[in-house]
Amino acid sequence: QYGKDYPAILPAAAYKVTRQTGAGRGVYSFCMCPGGWVVNASSEEGHLAVNGMSYQARDSRNANSAMIVTVTPDDFPGTDVLAGVEFQRKLEKAAYGLCDGKVPVQLFGDFCRNVPSTMLGEVEPCIKGQYELSNVRTIFPQELSSALEEGIKGCEALIHGFSRADAVLSGVESRTSSPVRIIRNTEFESELSGLYPCGEGAGYAGGITSAAMDGLKIAEAIAKKYVPCYD
């Protein structure tokens, strides 16, 4: 992003990219980590989910971000209220099974050809936890993997080298937003008085900033109810 002339005085570069596929799906970067790490963030036995993080110095070899493909209820069968959760768990189970719990890694060029990676290129993964070269594409339904490929290739027009053949894909980041939303009333309470659904897990945010803003609203609602002098 900044070039190579002044590395001593410039911070690690951040980016944000978004594209729309020919089929109408959105593909966009999420939780971009300059000079960051991919971490194994699994929370359920037999399932695997990854996330991204940066230390304060932001000085690892790589930048990383989740590349998100939008989904709709048409992508998962059934009308149960938790059908989206089951779809998420299905992806995480497939990711776990691919490399027996290690983070599956694939070069983007191999992803496009739908073949397992057998060696790395110039880009070396920065991953906390064990990883293994594999075929990340097999985790996803065809519609999602095709959209991801098209979206990443489209981002080349925004950042030169974004879709280079040896760019590293890791999977799967499936916790970007909640697949369910806990209903709350005009006072921000759930059906159970005094219980305030809030933030990403409750379905009211999609990132750190929006979760913080939702938290402020909830704090104000609680103060207004329980501290009469708040107004």
Segments from the language model and where they lie:
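Residues forming the flavin
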Residues: 1-231
